[in-house]
A protein has these predicted regions:
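Intrinsically disordered, charged low-complexity linkers and terminal tails
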Residues: 1-105
Length: 105
């Protein structure tokens, strides 16, 4: 499983937790979801799920909370290809580079 510099283990996070976070995002909308969980909009990578685009770092942070009951804020882990985007990819999700709207490399 992927590791991040500040969060010791991502092992508790499963695809179902990511889908739960995405469902909450859909219910609340981007602005409310990000505000409620204290995240900003994605600057580099997006999660692609069911043809929808999500702020990858925010989704992973909320998925971690669904998995463990412990909230993570934006300063608790990194969001790049070696952080949130890499963790989501390791869980089998598609990640897109926000700059070119294509798959992340």
């Amino acid at each position: 499983m992927a590791y991040d510099r500040l969060v010791t283990r991502w092992d508790p996070v499963q695809p179902r937790h990511v889908r739960q976070a995405a469902a909450e995002y859909d219910r609340l909308g981007q602005d409310e979801f990000l505000a409620r969980h204290h995240f900003g909009p994605a600057t580099a990578y997006l999660l692609i799920l069911d043809d929808k685009r999500y702020d990858s770092k925010a989704i992973l942070g909320v998925a971690y909370q669904y998995a463990t009951g412990r909230p993570l804020g934006p300063h608790d882990f990194s969001g790049g290809v070696h952080g949130a985007a890499g963790v989501l990819r390791s869980l089998g999700f598609e990640i897109a580079n926000i700059r070119d709207r294509g798959p992340a490399t």
